[in-house]
């Protein structure tokens, strides 16, 4: 029987103190962290949940015994259809600032809480060379409108961010039977990518 791909990746994590940080865009990122947190606990890891807003409230209720950190993220807004491109471009300074802010905040958290590994669910700035850093996304190929050139540029930027991390976990299946379609399969996946199967809070 084939081993669960998520558990296979978790078995490769060195160190015991793991910080997991979901993006605060609704509850989707937080809910798909639930099976990851459960698998980490089963693997006898110490889990630190770093989030803000409703994701933090939700995960505190799901895992009341785990340590939590209020780790805020600056909201970025999408526009609609063609206006989405200009909306995203107008927010690039804010986007860049937020990545740098997260990056330096992570360094302080690592030293304060003795973190061995960080798992970031779509938070762009959480990589640090002194520890093992994992990025989770099902949307390798970011879609920001109907303009193929802009979508390709967004993919290349996202790929550059992803490759700052040691690993990229894609919550989908590779090849036939995948559910994310072009979001994860249109362009070549980053060299550090691993497909870990579908994630559900009911796993």
Where is each model-derived feature located?
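A nucleotide-sugar donor-handling region in carbohydrate enzymes
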Residues: 2, 144-152, 158-203
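Residues in the short beta-alpha loop(s) of Rossmann-like NAD(P)-binding domains
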Residues: 53-55, 139, 174
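Active-site proximal beta-strand in glycosyltransferases
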Residues: 129-145
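A short, glycine/small-residue-rich beta-strand->loop->alpha-helix junction that serves as a flexible
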Residues: 22-34
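Structural motif
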Residues: 17, 116-117, 167
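Conserved nucleotide-sugar donor-binding subdomain of glycosyltransferases
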Residues: 83-125
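Conserved nucleotide-sugar phosphate-binding/catalytic loop shared by glycosyltransferases and other
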Residues: 7, 14-17, 23-24, 42-93
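Gly/Ala-rich phosphate-binding loop of Rossmann-like dinucleotide-binding domains
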Residues: 37, 41
């Amino acid at each position: 029987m084939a081993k669960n791909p998520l558990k296979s990746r978790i078995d490769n994590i060195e160190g015991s103190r793991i910080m997991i940080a979901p993006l605060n865009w609704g509850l989707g990122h937080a809910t798909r962290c639930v099976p990851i947190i459960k698998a980490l606990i089963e693997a006898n890891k110490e889990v630190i949940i770093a989030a803000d807003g409703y994701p933090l409230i939700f995960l505190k209720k799901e895992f009341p015994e785990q340590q939590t950190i209020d780790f805020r993220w600056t909201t970025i807004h999408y526009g609609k259809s063609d206006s989405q491109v200009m909306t995203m471009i107008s927010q690039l300074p804010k986007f860049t600032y937020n990545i740098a802010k997260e990056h330096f905040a992570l360094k302080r958290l690592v030293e304060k809480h003795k973190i061995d590994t960080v798992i970031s669910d779509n938070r762009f700035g959480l990589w640090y060379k002194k520890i093992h850093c994992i990025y989770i996304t099902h949307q390798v190929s970011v879609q920001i409108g109907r303009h193929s050139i802009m979508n390709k540029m967004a993919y290349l930027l996202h790929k550059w961010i992803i490759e700052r991390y040691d690993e990229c976990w894609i919550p989908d299946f590779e090849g036939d039977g995948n559910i994310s379609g072009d979001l994860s399969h249109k362009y070549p996946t980053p060299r550090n990518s691993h497909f870990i199967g579908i994630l559900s809070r009911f796993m």
